[in-house]
A protein has these predicted regions:
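SF2 helicase motor core recognition
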Residues: 205, 216-231, 250-258
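A short beta-strand element within the Helicase C-terminal
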Residues: 224-239, 263-267
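Amphipathic, heptad-repeat alpha-helical coiled-coil/stalk segments that mediate oligomerization
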Residues: 197, 202-203, 236, 243-246, ...
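Helicase motor interdomain insertion/brace
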Residues: 1-175, 180-184, 209, 222-224, ...
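Conserved beta-strand -> loop -> alpha-helix junction used to position metal-binding or nucleic-acid-contacting
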Residues: 174-186, 239, 248, 262-272
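A conserved SF2-helicase RecA2
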Residues: 212, 244-250, 254-280
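Conserved helicase ATPase core of P-loop NTP-dependent helicases/translocases
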Residues: 175-219
Length: 280
C-alpha cells in the first residue's frame, strides 16, 4: 500500500482516482496464483519504466491512465488531464515517485522469481497448482472416462495449470484428449494428435460429448455460451469474487441435459486469503 500507484497520485494529487477498484483487481490476481501475481507486478513495472522517459521530458501518454477515454479530443484532454492541469504537474515529484515505485516492484519481482524457481522435480512451487494436479489425478483414477473442466479467470494461471496437468499425464503415461478455451484462443488436441489444432466452440463441445477429449482448461470466456454438461466435475483454481460469476461457471455443467445424478465442484484457495474468508 505504501507504494501502490503513487505515480498516478503524484500526477493528479487533487483528483479522486479509483484506487479501490484497481486494488481489488490486483488482489484478485494475486489470489489466483503465484504466476498471475508475478505477471501483474512485472506488467506494472514495465508500464512505469516505459513511462519514465516521458516524465523526464514533462510528457505523459494517453495510455498511462487505464481509465482514459480513447475518444477524448487530444486538444482538450491528455491522459485525463486538461492542458491547464498538465502545466501544473510537479514533474520532479512524479519522477521521484515513479522511480520509488519501480524500486519497490523490482524487489517484489525478484522475490516472485525466487519463489517460482524454487521448485523441485515434479512439484510446482504454487500449492494451488499442486492441489489441482492432485484433484485431477484422483478424479481420473476414480472416474475413468468421465470428463472434467478446470477453470481459472486468468490466462497466466491457466497456462501453468495446463502445463502441470499435461506434464503429469506424460510422466504417468496417461493419454487423453484435451482442449483449451481462453476467449479467442481455442485449441484442441486429441489423444492421437502430435500438435494442437485450432477449434471452434462447437468443435470443443462435440469432442467433449463424444468422448474424444476428457478435460477442458477454461478461462472466464467459457463461463458463458458453452453447454458442457457432458462433464460432471469442475475444479475452480480460483474462485470468482462475484457470486453470480461463480454461478455462471457452475451453470456450464449443472444444467438441463446433465446425465449424472450429481455434479461435483472443488474450489481451491490459499489458507487465510481473501477468497477463503469470502467463501467460508
Amino acid at each position: 500500500d505504501r507504494f501502490y500507484q503513487i505515480t498516478e497520485l503524484a500526477i493528479t494529487p487533487d483528483k479522486q482516482l479509483p484506487l479501490g477498484l484497481r486494488r481489488h483487481s490486483l488482489q484478485e490476481r494475486f489470489a489466483s496464483s503465484f504466476w498471475s501475481a508475478k505477471k501483474s507486478i512485472t506488467n506494472r513495472r514495465e508500464h512505469l519504466i516505459n513511462s519514465l522517459e516521458g516524465f523526464k521530458e514533462n510528457k505523459i501518454t494517453k495510455e498511462f491512465f487505464e481509465n482514459s477515454d480513447e475518444n477524448d479530443d487530444e486538444d482538450t484532454i491528455i491522459a485525463g488531464l486538461t492542458k491547464s492541469e498538465l502545466v501544473s504537474v510537479d514533474w520532479e515529484n512524479v519522477i521521484k515517485n515513479c522511480e520509488s515505485e519501480i524500486r519497490a516492484l523490482n524487489t517484489y519481482v525478484d522475490l516472485a522469481e525466487i519463489v517460482i524457481n524454487s521448485t523441485t522435480e515434479g512439484i510446482d512451487p504454487d500449492p494451488k497448482i499442486n492441489e489441482t494436479v492432485r484433484l485431477f489425478s484422483e478424479h481420473i483414477d476414480k472416474n475413468p472416462g468421465k470428463p472434467l473442466l478446470i477453470f481459472s479467470k486468468y490466462t497466466d494461471t491457466l497456462n501453468e495449470v495446463e502445463r502441470a496437468v499435461i506434464s503429469y499425464c506424460e510422466t504417468n503415461d496417461i493419454y487423453m484428449g484435451y482442449a483449451s478455451y481462453r476467449g479467442d484462443y481455442r485449441r484442441i488436441k486429441y489423444a492421437n494428435d502430435r500438435e494442437h489444432r485450432k477449434a471452434e466452440k462447437r468443435d470443443i463441445t462435440r469432442a467433449l460429448n463424444n468422448g474424444r477429449i476428457q478435460v477442458i482448461f477454461c478461462s472466464s470466456a467459457a463461463s458463458e455460451g458453452l453447454n458442457l454438461q457432458a462433464a460432471s466435475y469442475m475444479i475452480n483454481v480460483d474462485v470468482p469474487w462475484v457470486p453470480s460469476d461463480l454461478e455462471q461457471r457452475i451453470g456450464r455443467i449443472a444444467r438441463l441435459g446433465q446425465k449424472e445424478d450429481e455434479v461435483v465442484i472443488d474450489n481451491i484457495w490459499y489458507p487465510f486469503s481473501i477468497e477463503s474468508n469470502m467463501y467460508k
